[in-house]
Amino acid sequence: MTASHGTAPSPFKQPRAVWAVAFACVVSFMGIGLVDPILPALAGSLHATPSQVSLLFTSYLVVTAVAMLAVGWVSSRIGAKRTLIAGLVLIVIFAGLAGTSNSIGGIVGFRAGWGLGNALFIATSLAVIVASASGGFAGAIILYETALGLGIAVGPLLGGELGSISWRGPFFGVAVLMFIALVATIAFVPNLPKPEHKTSLAAPLKALRHRGLLTMGIMALLYNWGFFTMLGYAPYPMELNAHKLGLVFTGWGLLVAAFSVFFAPRLQARFGTAKVLYVNLFCLGIVMAVIAIGVNTPAAVIVAVIVSGAFIGINNTLTTQAVMLVSPVERPVASSAYGFVRFIGGGLAPFVAGKLADATNLSVPFYLGGVAFILAIVVLASGHKLVDAAEKGAVEGEPVCPSLQRVGATPAPGYQPVIVAVGAIENADEIVDAAALMARDAGRPLEVVHIRETAVVEELAIDAEDAEQARATVLSHLDRLFTLGIAATGQVLTSVGDHAAAGRVLAQHANDIDARAIAVGRSPRGQAAQFADGSFTTAVLHNAARTVVMVEPGKAPHRLSA
């Protein structure tokens, strides 16, 4: 894999195609937060009740949920770029129409069309960025996560500023920004090849027959029930104008972004997925109870909502991770199935909350949201053994915990190789060849360990390469080394989201076979990303009782220290 020392390639040196899609991602992730500050103003201007206004969330999220079942089918037939453009066109049209509407019913209907466009966009945007990015897979993921964090944090601020002028402002703002992104996407994003494998329309629903995926999906539904109850109804008891609501939800969004990207992976690595989710869901239940009890105290509601951003950020990351851990199907199919169940919960919650608030009082929906968070703990507990088994590698299907698979011939016992760990990066051949020279000088064989990486972002999971491509890469290294007269063997190390865990697995493997040394290259992810989700190289250094060296083309290998 890679080391954290020195200067990493910048993920922000990208082609115009990547920046076009990344800009659209920022606007898309603004989505919910952009609308939240205008909810009270919208209700007042259109003489609508909070329960009627809540249908803006319901129509948007329910349509997004249902569309998630079909986006894989669509994109595998017309290609990622056309799917992306279709999504952007729909968002531009329906966001603009929502801004021109003079009735709450009209806005609710146009939000449904917006939700369809959103589903088409979010399901393909990450794949387009990865396919178009320079500097490798890691740089593309960093850029996408940056767009995610920026959109979540800035959305409420922009919504508050535009909403202070008119409740129509955020709708027109999205339409204009997405139109700019649409033009840039058409102009700069190249046509991408269609997938070789066409996704079945029924595949996501069939995937839900697997107990693990269904269990984690129901947990996500309950979590989203509580989350969108808070998001849809908390603005009313705050008694703030659009500008001040925007500032409150900006604080919330900053915590969501920070804890999603920086803290959730480290907590997961330290305590495990299930344990962190138990505590986190319980804390969210407490926050909802505070809002319910203090519903007539605006300051209490404001503080509780801002604090909830930390727990929401952790849950958004780890819930998807849990889904991918237990899912035995292809990850894009698992993402679609999970997105369907997740958004259904988010869509129904505001509708039910509105009916409850009308029939009782405003505190009851928040109590129900708190109960939903606690029920999510119960559902997670029913699947705890599945998550634990997945983290230990004892499940069928695609590998979800770091695992090694031998490629080519099995070496004789006691071969004590030099191990080189390298990912799908541009100079992988040069790193392997530099390590091969080091192994030859030491009189030892070389073992090439190729890192096959899967990134998990929000409800999406994407592979840098499939299993066959990773295997072919290792065989290519072995063939090249054979022509150079260097004895070598190969393995593929599968890593799903957790780089540090992959480093620990490699370190243990090196200890088990009494490897002479471990060679790594320089990280393409950068120090900030490595701090966020754990450094592969740091984990190797802390867990391997071996010499760890960094190899770079044209430079002498040098030893690393913990």
Regions found by a protein language model. Give the residues of each.
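Cytoplasmic helix-loop-helix junction between adjacent transmembrane helices
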Residues: 110-150
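Helix-loop-helix hairpin linking two adjacent transmembrane segments in secondary transporters
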Residues: 142-187
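Glycine-rich, Arg-bearing micro-motifs that act as flexible, cationic patches
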Residues: 517-543, 557-560
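Helix-to-loop junctions at the C-terminal end of transmembrane segments
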Residues: 68-79, 259-273, 357
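Conserved MFS/SLC helix-loop-helix module at the cytosolic interface between two early adjacent transmembrane helices
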Residues: 66-102
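Small/aliphatic-rich secondary-structure junction motif
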Residues: 411-462, 486-489, 543
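C-terminal transmembrane helical hairpin of 12-TM major facilitator-type secondary transporters
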Residues: 274-319
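C-terminal membrane-cytosol helix-exit motif in multi-pass small-molecule transporters
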Residues: 175-194, 377-384
